[in-house]
């Protein structure tokens, strides 16, 4: 009985989020992603001032707005964002989806910022997407490059990630069962 109720609640949450997303045109969705990215970067620069120089000298970056829910044993998240090539300023619109297991109840609104040290890492992210699994403790990796990526977690060679919650930069990054991929609808011009 409890599983049936939980399943119905999760389906309802998913359907409501799809209805809310479906109202915007592709142009409106692109503009929302741009505004979200600008605001998120401004917030990050206030919380981690060294991040601005790191992003400025990077090959590129990606910014995502994510909403996660955890209901008893099931956790899910979905989001959208934009990746930018720092040299060419080319924008690529992307999506994120995540699923996992873990005990808890709640909703988490958070932002994820990827910083790509080199073109190879950026191109791999853009062309192959990215799948994350596991957890990383940001405090354990904060000292590389004389603090250039202070507050970030290295998730792959040349790829650093900041996670911002309403309380600031998260000290622990969770990317379990997470997939980032291109949004084909928004990348059509």
Q: Residues of each region from the PLM?
A:
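Small-residue-enriched, tightly packed secondary-structure blocks
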Residues: 23-189
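N-terminal secretory signal peptides that target proteins for export/translocation
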Residues: 1-5
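Bacterial N-terminal signal peptides
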Residues: 9-18
């Amino acid at each position: 009985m409890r599983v049936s109720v939980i399943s119905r609640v999760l389906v309802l949450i998913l359907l409501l989020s799809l209805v809310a997303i479906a109202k915007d045109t592709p142009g409106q969705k692109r503009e929302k992603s741009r505004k979200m990215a600008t605001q998120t970067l401004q917030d990050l620069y206030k919380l981690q001032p060294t991040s601005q120089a790191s992003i400025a000298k990077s090959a590129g970056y990606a910014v995502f707005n994510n909403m996660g829910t955890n209901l008893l044993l099931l956790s899910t998240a979905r989001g959208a964002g934009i990746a930018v090539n720092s040299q060419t300023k080319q924008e690529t619109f992307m999506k994120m989806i995540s699923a996992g297991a873990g005990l808890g109840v709640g909703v988490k609104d958070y932002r994820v910022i990827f910083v790509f040290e080199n073109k190879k890492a950026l191109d791999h992210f853009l062309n192959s997407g990215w799948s994350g699994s596991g957890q990383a403790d940001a405090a354990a990796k904060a000292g590389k490059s004389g603090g250039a990526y202070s507050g970030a977690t290295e998730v792959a060679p040349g790829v650093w990630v900041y996670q911002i919650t309403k309380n600031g930069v998260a000290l622990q990054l969770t990317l379990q069962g997470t997939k980032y991929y291109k949004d084909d609808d928004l990348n059509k011009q």
